From Swiss-Prot:
InterPro entries: Bbox_C, Bromodomain, Bromodomain-like_sf, TRIM66_Bbox1_Znf, Zinc_finger_PHD-type_CS, Znf_B-box, Znf_FYVE_PHD, Znf_PHD. It comes from Homo sapiens. It is found in: Nucleus. Keywords: Bromodomain, Coiled coil, Metal-binding, Nucleus, Repeat, Zinc, Zinc-finger. The lineage of its organism: Eukaryota, Metazoa, Chordata, Craniata, Vertebrata. This is Tripartite motif-containing protein 66. Residues 542-608, 663-730, 857-895, 1067-1098, 1289-1351 are annotated as: Disordered. Residues 234-304 form a coiled coil. GO terms for cellular component: chromatin; nucleus. A zinc finger (PHD-type) spans 1105-1152.
């Protein structure tokens, strides 16, 4: 440390000075604070505690004693590790000067007795003086000392601060060391001055201190200058480091660009070879296919004649045989004389030949790195590429003199085999050293190495000598261990006389080019060795003795020349080129190829080839995945309501379908995902929650013994009732949940445009039976919420929300427009409308089937849980109803019902749900109660099935009353539901269903007035007759209706264990009764809304969808007149040949027993009356199977199963031996197909095989496996509905593992040879793996467009 760093008495302590003081006050060895006394100061100005200093001395003494040496009194500083003599270590007196507290800023005068405040410091005597004492202060000689004035005498520190320090003389203990002897260079006192230093030069300590400070300031200034210069140097070095990093990145980019140039050239060459290979193989295959086709034609004629002769010989009629024997013999003779080329030719092989050793050696000598400037020595320049000690190579040829001259003045150049051929070969390469540009090569001493070309081609050749062209071509030749001949096969051979002039012209053109130096040892070696190069080529070998070398360009034959000595001026003239040149000239990228032998690659080459092979496979896999995504993009078009996360998971599922990777767990936040909340008993097995396509309105079927016939007259006379008026439809979203296996299946929300009528119809068309009509309730105001509830025994859900009220379902029930109403699986479709997403239960009916409509409204008057009184009963009423208002008894667990949920948006009219029934007065909805509802997510209901005692279930309705009395009144009367009981109910299971409610998010859209409708249910004045008043309030408008429950039917239903019907009677406030509907008994009454100004309205027409129900794409679509689905002609099953005229219904809506129309398809020609029935499915089974397959194709989850798995997925076909998909099934449904189905069991077997393959290949938690399970459950439900009387065997595992013996598309002869198809369309070209540049550009733009649209 320096004295300038010490704090002065009058200065404030800045933070920096405080840090320095902290450093000064710390021991360098133990890093502890120094005490006030006993510290030591080293020459390097590091400090040591007294104990630490003595410890170092003792340690040095022990070391010296151990080595039997004498300690030379040296000490090593622990801070800077410098060695000093121990005698140079002094005591740190500065610690005595350091004040223990902050020095005072105010000073007192040292002269006056009043101790006034001092203002001036006398620099001569270093005393503070006040203003008055300053005038009297003088410096005059005193008798006490001749060397210093009187004013400087006296005891110091009289007025000093606490930081003053006095040092006494060791000889005169009373004297203070205030003098400094410059002669002896030591402090002394006044007595010592008189005795020992009398003749010496002595000065006062303060004066000496001032002089020393001036000297130290000068030294400090020099140190500061030196420090600034060092900082400048450090900054320059940092800039150099940054420049080195920048140059590194720049050169690295240049190397990468060179790599890309090489890769592009290699890709072009490889593409050319592949094109050539395709041309060769296609021509060969075309000839063989023509030969095979002719053999097949002749074989069919032989079979026909042979079959006819066998039939004629075996027949009992001999006269026709004898009559036509001449014709038969003539035909046989003609066939025997027919000649056919059956010679397949000699064995044909094709292979790809190339020189891996040569190319890997050339790649190992790729480029070099040069530097300019600097003073880097040769030893400091590292060698790269394993060429240490070798001379740098330049791309040209020089004489040995030029080589020695170039080697004697080497530039700073790292070892590498090649350099770019021009000063700036491309925009990414750095320029070559200017010293290399001035070197002019003399004429080559090896004329064979010169370029043989006409003068007009010299500039073009020089222009092509760039880095991108030389790296894979001439540069490798110039850099090979033995300098080969630089062949130019694309040039004509010149006479030897012209070679020298050509070389001279070339040397003149290469004046501005960097020359290539070949080492002398390499030149000498090159004089005795002539390497043989072989470029990639394709050889087609016919037989064992024929070889044909094919290439895009003409190649010169290999020249076998003896190695000429170096002094020879000219080599022997080369052989003339072949006379025939059918191919274009060879570009510079080609060299002379050797067709005699192929040297095996070395270990390094094999390793490099393996790495290149793996990289190529990875790139191919990436391209295959991109092609797959591009090919499957049209099938992945989802609704705009889908989130990007859902789109990404869909694409990931498609990729996982190919590469067999487990997909991530589906997000729980998805609105389409419905999870099973409870597990079924162990006897049923665990079945996960499965989403189901919403386009299907089919429920899971029951057992065949669960049919419930209804004694209702047919409605053939009332089917055709249509209305010309167009009314906006109800957009609904339907989802299905089957209780038979405790599976919850929710419909995806991709298509929300679904009218209510086709959904009801599709639900009813799932079962087989005679057309029937179901009596039900007339619809209430369609703008209000309707909710159907399930029937459970001794189980009432907790309705804990006080601001919700469930409204009875008021649904119109004339199911007369449905031609096939089958009572196989009674179902209930119900939902609860609520403005709160977490409240409001909605229970399902065990035997009822109805179609509710959802709306949103604040519901009121929900009784507390304590007011809910469960009802027990032993009777069972299993009739079908259209609405239920109170849950009565437990649902029959044997009925295995399914819940259909619908969400309604922009609800308008709800009259005549099927659109074709008779018009009943009072069915229309008031316009003043319009409630648009946009419910994208319906309330999901599921059933928990604990093992309980079997209980007979009945149809009940939701209880909505304030006290038990109201509930009891309602149980005794209200709602006369007249429906015939199910006479074939099977034995009850040992389980009991307990309903529970799980609510999901509801998007509630308020009315135009901003208020939601309010529903209130109040008992009327006379509580004994069971009359209730339903009030609907929406803003300032209100409507009311009266509901009356009869008591006689209620008592019968609760007492009689037999199966009897219940009747519902609802009358209006005015006491009007609607006319009876044809086909119903007088006891069956309908619910009529009492609304002012209600008018009869026409039924709502069907609005069709905008996209095909199968492929989800647009275009020219065919609309069904009974459901909203639309189809392409080729997507429908069966595929149609033309657009029909007039009314048209799809396969899903067409009746199986009495089809409304016949399709114009290819199968129609086989169903002509006069044509013999072809072997295969019957017409009835054909329609059933087509309906099955179309239902699968219309399911959104079936998208991965529409087409076969891509052949790019190699592992799939290694695992799955018998692939199956819907396209194969649809093709085999066509009667023209040779593998046409003969029985429905074959169709079901193929469908189940498809699901089996999906489950076998994909991981269980992947999306495709989940979709396969959902689709399988959906298919089994349809199968039981369409074939309730059949039981199909499950596929065995060996069916999927074993390969098929015979071809699907071919016919097998008695000998077992699978002949290919007769027609030419059976020969399909293999899908190409390679794509051209424009196709890759299109794919890239398509992928970018898709990525932007998803963002």
């Amino acid at each position: 440390m320096s004295f300038m760093g010490l704090p002065l008495a009058g200065q404030k302590h800045c933070p920096k000075s405080g840090q320095m003081e902290a450093m000064v006050m710390t021991c360098s060895l133990c890093h502890q604070d120094l005490p006030g006394m006993g510290s030591h100061l080293l020459s390097c100005q590091h400090l040591l505690r007294k104990d630490c200093f003595q410890g170092l001395i003792q340690e040095l003494g022990q070391i010296a004693k151990a080595h039997e040496t004498v300690a030379d009194e040296l000490i090593s500083c622990p801070g800077c590790e410098r060695v000093y003599l121990t005698r140079d270590v002094t005591e740190h007196f500065f610690l005595h000067c350091v004040p223990t507290e902050q020095p005072k800023m105010a000073r007192n005068c040292s002269e006056c007795k009043e101790k006034r405040a001092a203002h001036i410091l006398c620099t001569y005597c270093n005393r503070w003086l006040c203003s008055s004492c300053t005038e009297e202060h003088r410096h005059s000689p005193v008798p006490g000392g001749p060397f210093f004035p009187r004013a400087q005498k006296g005891s110091p520190g009289v007025n000093g601060g606490p930081g003053d320090f006095t040092l006494y003389c060791p000889l005169h203990t009373q004297e203070v060391l205030k003098l400094f002897c410059e002669t002896c260079d030591m402090l002394t006192c006044h007595s010592c001055l008189v005795v020992e230093h009398k003749e010496h030069r002595c000065r006062h300590v303060e004066e000496v201190l001032q002089n020393q400070r001036m000297l130290l300031e000068g030294v400090t200034t020099q140190v500061a200058h030196k420090k600034s210069s060092l900082q400048t140097s450090a900054k320059q070095i940092e800039d150099r480091i940054f420049e080195v990093k920048h140059q590194h990145r720049k050169v690295e980019n240049q190397i990468k660009m060179a790599k890309m140039v090489l890769m592009n050239e290699l890709n072009k060459q490889a593409n050319g070879l592949i094109e050539e290979l395709e041309g060769i193989t296609n021509e060969r295959k075309r000839k063989l296919e023509q030969q095979l086709q002719s053999i097949m034609v002749l074989n069919r004629q032989f079979e026909h004649v042979q079959n006819f002769i066998n039939w004629a010989v075996c027949s009992k009629t001999s006269v026709p045989f004898l009559f036509s024997k001449e014709l038969i013999v003539f035909q046989m003779q003609r066939l025997l004389e027919t000649s056919c080329n059956t010679d397949p030719g000699s064995p044909w092989s094709i292979r790809f030949t190339w020189e891996p050793n040569f190319w890997t050696k050339q790649l190992a000598s790729l480029g070099c790195i040069t530097t300019e400037g600097g003073q880097m020595s040769r030893a400091d320049a590292p060698a790269y590429g394993g060429l240490q000690g070798s001379s740098p190579f330049y791309q040209s040829h020089q004489s040995p003199v030029a080589q020695q001259e170039a080697l004697s003045h080497p530039s700073h150049k790292f070892q590498s085999p090649a350099v770019c051929s021009s000063s700036v070969c491309c925009s990414h390469c750095s320029p070559v050293s200017p010293s290399l540009k001035g070197q002019v090569p003399p004429p080559s001493i090896h004329p064979a190495h010169s370029f043989r070309q006409p003068p007009e081609m010299v500039p073009q050749q020089l222009g092509s000598l760039q880095c991108s062209a030389l790296l894979p071509r001439e540069k490798e030749l110039a850099c090979s261990p033995h300098p080969p001949k630089l062949l130019q096969p694309w040039l004509e051979t010149q006479p030897p006389v012209e070679q020298e002039s050509t070389s001279q012209r070339l040397g003149q053109q290469l004046t501005s080019q960097p020359v290539c130096i070949v080492p002398p040892q390499d030149v000498q070696q090159g004089a005795h060795a002539q390497p043989t190069l072989q470029t990639p080529s394709i050889q087609v070998q016919f037989g064992h003795h024929q070889k044909l070398k094919l290439s895009h360009f003409q190649q010169q034959p290999q020249q076998q020349l003896p190695p000429p000595p170096p002094p020879l001026p000219h080599p022997p003239p080369p052989l003339p080129p072949p006379p025939q040149q059918p191919h274009p000239p060879l570009p510079p990228s080609q060299h002379l190829a050797s067709s005699q032998h192929e040297s095996p690659p070395g270990p390094a080459c094999s390793q490099n080839m393996d790495i290149m092979h793996h990289k190529f496979e990875l790139e191919e896999m990436q391209k295959d995945l991109e092609l797959l995504l591009q090919a499957q993009q049209p099938s992945l078009q989802l609704s705009q309501t889908k989130s990007p996360q859902h789109l990404q998971q869909t694409i990931v599922g498609q990729i996982n379908y190919i590469v067999r990777q487990p997909a991530p767990v589906q997000s729980q936040s998805q609105e389409e995902t419905l999870q099973a909340t409870d597990e079924p008993p162990a006897s049923q097995g665990s079945k996960p929650a499965l989403p189901l396509d919403k386009n299907t309105a089919a429920a899971l079927p029951q057992a065949s013994g669960e049919e419930t016939p209804l004694s209702v007259p047919p409605v053939d006379s009332t089917i055709q009732h249509s209305s010309p008026n167009v009314v906006r439809k109800h957009s609904t979203s339907l989802s299905i949940m089957g209780f038979s296996n405790t599976l919850e299946m929710e419909l995806s929300s991709t298509r929300l445009e679904r009218p209510l009528e086709p959904q009801i119809q599709s639900v009813s068309n799932l079962t087989a039976g005679a057309p029937q009509a179901v009596p039900s309730l007339l619809s209430a105001p369609p703008k209000m919420v309707s909710s159907l509830t399930s029937v459970q025994n001794q189980a009432m859900p907790s309705l804990t929300t006080s601001h919700l009220q469930t409204v009875p379902s008021l649904v119109h029930s004339t199911f007369q427009s449905m031609p096939n109403l089958i009572s196989d699986s009674p179902q209930a479709m119900a939902s609860l409308a609520s403005d709160h997403p977490q409240a409001g239960p909605s229970l399902m009916s065990g035997h009822t089937q109805a179609v509710p409509s959802l709306a949103t409204c604040p519901l009121q008057s929900i009784p507390p849980v304590s007011d809910m009184q469960p009802e027990t009963g032993s009777s069972s009423s299993s009739g079908r109803t259209s609405g239920s208002l109170c849950p009565r008894d437990g649902a029959d667990p044997s009925l295995e019902n399914a819940l259909c949920k619908m969400e309604s948006e922009d609800s308008t009219r709800f009259t005549d749900l099927l659109g074709q029934g008779p018009i009943v007065p009072g069915l229309d909805a008031p316009k003043d109660l319009a409630i648009p509802s946009e419910l994208e997510e319906p309330i999901n209901l599921s059933v928990k099935k604990p093992p309980l005692a079997p209980v007979v279930s009945t149809s009940t309705a939701l209880q909505q009353y304030q006290n038990p009395k109201e509930c009891e009144n309602f149980e005794q009367g209200a709602l006369e539901l007249d429906a015939k009981e199910n006479q074939s109910i099977r034995a009850f299971n040992s389980e009991h269903k307990i309903p529970y409610v799980r609510l999901e998010r509801l998007k509630i859209c308020a009315a135009s007035s901003g208020e939601m409708p309010v529903f209130k249910l109040k008992p009327q004045k006379n509580d004994q007759d069971g009359s209730f008043l339903l009030i609907i309030e929406c803003g300032t408008e209100s409507s009311s209706m009266s509901i009356k429950v009869s008591q006689d039917r209620l008592s019968e239903a609760t007492q009689a264990p037999g199966l009897e019907g219940r009747k519902v009677t609802v009358t209006s406030l005015a006491g009007q009764r609607p006319p009876e509907v044809e086909g119903t008994s007088p006891e069956e009454h309908r619910l009529i809304p009492r609304t002012p100004g209600a008018k009869k309205g026409p039924p709502a027409p069907i609005e069709n969808e905008d996209f095909c129900a199968v492929c989800l794409n647009g275009g020219e679509l065919l609309c069904c007149d009974r459901c909203p689905k639309v189809f392409h002609l080729s997507c429908h099953v069966p595929a149609l040949l033309s657009f029909p005229g007039g009314e048209w219904v799809c396969t899903l809506c067409r009746s199986l027993t009495q089809p409304e129309m016949e399709y114009d398809c290819e199968n129609a020609c086989y169903n002509q009356p006069g044509m013999r029935a072809s072997p295969g499915l019957s017409m009835y089974d054909q329609k059933k199977c087509e309906k099955l397959v179309l239902s699968l194709c219309c399911n959104n989850l079936s998208l991965p199963f529409h087409e076969p798995v891509s052949p790019l997925a190699r592992h799939y076909y290694q695992i799955i031996k018998r692939p199956m998909d819907l396209s194969i099934i649809r093709r085999k449904l066509q009667k023209k197909d040779p593998a046409h189905y003969t029985t429905p069991e074959e169709v079901v077997s193929d469908v189940r095989l498809m699901f089996w393959n999906c489950a076998k290949f994909n991981y269980p938690d992947s999306e495709v496996a989940e979709a396969g399970r959902c689709l399988e459950v959906f298919f089994e439900g349809w199968l039981k509905e369409i074939y309730p009387e059949k039981r199909f065997a499950q596929p065995r595992q060996e069916d999927s593992d074993s390969e098929e013996v015979s071809s699907e598309s071919g016919c097998s002869t008695p000998q077992g040879f699978p002949w290919p198809p007769y027609m030419q369309e059976g020969i399909q070209p293999k899908r190409r793996r390679r794509h051209m540049e424009n196709e890759r550009a299109k794919r890239m733009s398509f992928r970018l467009a898709n990525s932007i649209s998803q963002v």
